[in-house]
Structure formats: structure tokens, C-alpha cells
């Protein structure tokens, strides 16, 4: 069976490194499903989940919350470089829910005070928190 190597790297180091049969990501241009021997590609990722179907167990799927970044696909090696990323098993759901509530309050406050930049940052924080919650509940 053909396989790919998937590596996810953040400023904190290597977060994920496994062989995969299939990978699904969301780019700014839409969903991208990746199988072995995929054409070489570079794309910008959305804040979303990465789905990795591992080679060692066809039923085993790893879910990773990725907060944007870049994906490079070259010669059956998938490299994702992101500001931050967390595997589903490492996500603290209660912490993510607190971050979500905090971001919602910040959005409301910034909107009321017409602070556009602060509102935009809070919306990004909300999107990241929701992504972490969605991925964290997949285990």
C-alpha cells in the first residue's frame, strides 16, 4: 500500500509525524483530499481540523486542530507549518470553552466600542477556540 509521511511543525517544534494513507485539510480555496502520489502543491490553510487516516490501522483517524499555516505536498511528504497545532488527545476542552466565552465577550465589547482591530482579533480567537473544541470532542 502506498503511503505518505505527514509532519506538522509549529514554533514549538514537531507536533505530529506519522505515515498516512489519506489526509484531508481545508485551504483558503476549499477542501483538499490528499492520497499518495498527489501532485506537488503548496497552499495556505484555514483555521480548521486536519484529518489523517493512518497506515497502521485503516480505522484509526488522527484529528489535529491547526490554526492556519501552509501545507506543502512533495514526493509523498506532507509538511504543514502552522503558528499552532494540537492533537485531539492533547486539547483541554474546558480551557477551549473558556477561551470561546472570553472571545465572545471581547467581540461584543469591541463591537460596542467600534474597535475594528480588536473585534477582528477576537473573531480569530473565537474561530480558534471553536476549532479546538470541535477537534477535541472527536476522541
Swiss-Prot record:
Broad class of where this protein is predominantly found: membrane
Cross-referenced SUPFAM superfamilies: Epsilon subunit of F1F0-ATP synthase N-terminal domain
GO molecular function: ATP binding; proton-transporting ATP synthase activity, rotational mechanism
Top-rank lineage group of the source organism: Bacteria
Topology in the lipid bilayer: Peripheral membrane protein
Pfam families: ATP-synt_DE, ATP-synt_DE_N
Cellular localisation: Cell membrane
CDD domains: F1-ATPase_delta (cd12152)
Keywords, sorted A to Z: ATP synthesis, Cell membrane, CF(1), Hydrogen ion transport, Ion transport, Membrane, Transport
InterPro entries for this protein: ATP_synth_F1_dsu/esu, ATP_synth_F1_dsu/esu_N, ATP_synth_F1_esu_C, ATPsynth_dsu/esu_N
GO cellular component, one term: proton-transporting ATP synthase complex
UniProt keyword annotation of Endoplasmic reticulum present: no
Main function: Produces ATP from ADP in the presence of a proton gradient across the membrane.
Subunit structure: F-type ATPases have 2 components, CF(1) - the catalytic core - and CF(0) - the membrane proton channel. CF(1) has five subunits: alpha(3), beta(3), gamma(1), delta(1), epsilon(1). CF(0) has three main subunits: a, b and c.
Protein family per UniProt: Belongs to the ATPase epsilon chain family.
PANTHER family recorded: ATP SYNTHASE DELTA/EPSILON CHAIN, ATP SYNTHASE EPSILON CHAIN, CHLOROPLASTIC
Listed name of the protein: ATP synthase epsilon chain
Species this chain originates from: Streptococcus sanguinis
Amino acid at each position: 500500500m502506498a503511503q505518505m509521511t505527514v509532519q506538522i511543525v509549529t514554533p514549538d517544534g514537531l507536533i505530529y509525524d506519522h505515515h498516512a494513507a489519506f489526509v484531508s485539510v481545508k485551504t483558503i480555496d476549499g477542501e483538499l483530499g490528499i492520497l499518495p502520489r498527489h501532485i506537488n502543491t503548496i497552499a495556505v490553510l484555514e483555521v480548521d481540523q486536519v484529518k489523517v487516516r493512518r497506515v497502521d490501522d485503516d480505522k484509526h483517524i488522527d484529528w489535529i486542530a491547526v490554526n492556519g499555516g501552509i501545507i506543502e505536498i512533495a514526493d509523498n511528504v506532507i509538511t504543514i507549518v502552522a503558528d499552532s497545532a494540537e492533537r485531539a488527545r492533547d486539547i483541554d476542552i474546558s480551557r477551549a470553552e473558556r477561551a470561546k466565552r472570553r472571545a465572545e465577550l471581547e467581540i461584543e465589547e469591541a463591537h460596542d466600542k467600534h474597535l475594528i482591530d480588536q473585534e477582528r482579533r477576537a473573531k480569530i480567537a473565537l474561530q480558534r477556540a471553536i476549532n479546538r473544541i470541535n477537534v477535541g470532542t472527536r476522541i
